[in-house]
Amino acid sequence: MLKIIIPTTMLLPMTWMSKHNMIWINATVHSLLISLISLSLLNQLGENSLNFSLTFFSDSLSAPLLVLTTWLLPLMLMASQSHLSKETTTRKKLYITMLILLQLFLIMTFTATELILFYILFEATLVPTLIIITRWGNQTERLNAGLYFLFYTLAGSLPLLVALVYIQNTTGSLNFLIIHYWSHPLSNSWSNIFMWLACIMAFMVKMPLYGLHLWLPKAHVEAPIAGSMVLAAVLLKLGGYGMMRITTILNPLTNYMAYPFLMLSMWGMIMTSSICLRQTDLKSLIAYSSVSHMALVIVAIMIQTPWSFMGATALMIAHGLTSSMLFCLANTNYERVHSRTMILARGLQTLLPLMATWWLMASLTNLALPPSINLIGELFIITASFSWSNITIILMGMNMMITALYSLYMLITTQRGKYTHHINNIKASFTRENALMALHILPLLLLTLNPKMILGPLY
């Protein structure tokens, strides 16, 4: 694990020592090299004693998420260049420092062995994200968004700390690898139910569960491009990862407690998809679509079968790349039209034909077109939920239909029709932007050839 953590740490002095015209090149190239090194972790053997240590370990669940995290840093740096072009050199370096720190915390969170260490790093990711949103966001509402983000996440994760201390006192260990061998099934007593809720709530807020999701659209809409990308692609996956790790420890209570959350997630999935159909703000639409996709992941994790876990992992990776790409595309529109309202930025296909191609590909992967990994993840989840209860197929089918509807609504509103008069003289798309979109879509296309790399715990 140190072969990734140490080079990432060394990005910090490198950024501050770079000359002002070399900052972006240095940071992007070196972070890309780190992400290429991390690809070796995807080749997980069955008995991988190589990747275990007392502090950090990686298995087939954390490796795909870890690679996604490292892959995203160069993409965030590429996307942010235009947004920061008017800032001073020191501020650019500070911004890059925040992104690198965030990546460092995320890598360590995904690979921590001790639950308390996991909790500390889980909370540490909050600080750089908050600074990125409240310092570099576009509108003044960013302060309000930062406040929502901070208090939802903090209030959700405080009970987790108490529950972890309680588990430590009863079992004597908080190590992920050891605690599984503590074969003491939890009874349905009130104290255990409260402990279960305390453990799960932090991750439910982070996912977010429908009803606890109000911070997400605000934070997404007000964050700068890199903030939106990392929030959608990796920070939401922390919730899913934490739930997968902790629900297996709390069995068989999870099976008993899962029903209300399953119903709420399925209902929320339909609701947030329907909200997407009425959005005028492009970033807000993509944010709500994230909530509906993550509701599917919550359903999968709560069902607790091997198939559903595989589906959850696949959908998390697929959604990370897809939503990040959609935010990049929304940002390219915003930089040209200076508005997030979809009606003001319509008919762009005639002006930016190559961007329209990227829009089409992103929308199609978002609505889970075969053979994309989004579809593979959704099929696993739908199969698992159907075998859990036949009635769920109605809700799942409705969700897939509404997802297709809002994806096409987004595509048609932004790309088709006659363009408005105030966007006659917009700039053509840059090579940087096209490379950025290609680096998002290529992993998605390549993973369709070998999806078992990201199917998580079973492979």
From Swiss-Prot:
Catalytic activities: a ubiquinone + NADH + 5 H(+)(in) = a ubiquinol + NAD(+) + 4 H(+)(out)
Topology term for the membrane: Multi-pass membrane protein
Bilayer-crossing regions: 22-42, 60-80, 98-118, 147-167, 193-213, 224-244, 257-277, 284-303, 308-330, 351-371, 391-413, 435-455
Pfam families with a match to the protein in the record: Oxidored_q5_N, Proton_antipo_M
Keyword Signal recorded: no
Gene Ontology cellular-component annotations: mitochondrial inner membrane; respiratory chain complex I
Gene Ontology MF terms: NADH dehydrogenase (ubiquinone) activity; ubiquinone binding
Keywords from the named record: Electron transport, Membrane, Mitochondrion, Mitochondrion inner membrane, NAD, Respiratory chain, Translocase, Transmembrane, Transmembrane helix, Transport, Ubiquinone
Subcellular location as annotated: Mitochondrion inner membrane
E.C. number(s) listed in UniProt: 7.1.1.2
Any one GO biological process: aerobic respiration
The keyword NAD is assigned to this record: yes
Task of the protein: Core subunit of the mitochondrial membrane respiratory chain NADH dehydrogenase (Complex I) which catalyzes electron transfer from NADH through the respiratory chain, using ubiquinone as an electron acceptor. Essential for the catalytic activity and assembly of complex I.
Quaternary assembly: Core subunit of respiratory chain NADH dehydrogenase (Complex I) which is composed of 45 different subunits.
NCBIfam families, A to Z: NDH_I_M
Family recorded in the similarity comment: Belongs to the complex I subunit 4 family.
Name of this chain's protein: NADH-ubiquinone oxidoreductase chain 4
Species this protein is from: Sus scrofa
